[in-house]
Curated annotation (Swiss-Prot):
Regions crossing the membrane: 21-35
Taxon lineage: Eukaryota, Viridiplantae, Streptophyta, Embryophyta, Tracheophyta
Name recorded for this polypeptide: Cytochrome b559 subunit alpha
Superkingdom to which the source organism belongs: Eukaryota
Summary of subunit composition and partner proteins: Heterodimer of an alpha subunit and a beta subunit. PSII is composed of 1 copy each of membrane proteins PsbA, PsbB, PsbC, PsbD, PsbE, PsbF, PsbH, PsbI, PsbJ, PsbK, PsbL, PsbM, PsbT, PsbX, PsbY, PsbZ, Psb30/Ycf12, at least 3 peripheral proteins of the oxygen-evolving complex and a large number of cofactors. It forms dimeric complexes.
Length: 83
């Protein structure tokens, strides 16, 4: 070994009691926070994605598919009006 930086080795860290006391609380907390973020619908609001029941409205039941090569801007305008 050429030199030491004075840092603890990874094996020392993960075998310490303090590591597991801290991480036994933080790791499950992250999973619970993520589950709440998605299950409450906050993820839809934050990222602006439509909720599962908002993909197709009563007036628009078809898929917004661009079919024309040269009139694509007009088709996009039609699709944006239906939102």
């Amino acid at each position: 070994m050429s030199g030491s930086t004075g840092e603890r080795s990874f094996a020392d860290i993960i075998t310490s009691i303090r590591y597991w006391v801290i991480h036994s609380i933080t790791i499950p907390s992250l999973f619970i926070a993520g589950w709440l973020f998605v299950s409450t619908g906050l993820a839809y609001d934050v990222f602006g994605s439509p909720r599962p029941n908002e993909y197709f409205t009563e007036s628009r039941q078809g898929i917004p598919l661009i079919t024309g090569r040269f009139d694509s801007l007009e088709q996009l305008d039609e699709f944006s009006k239906s939102f």
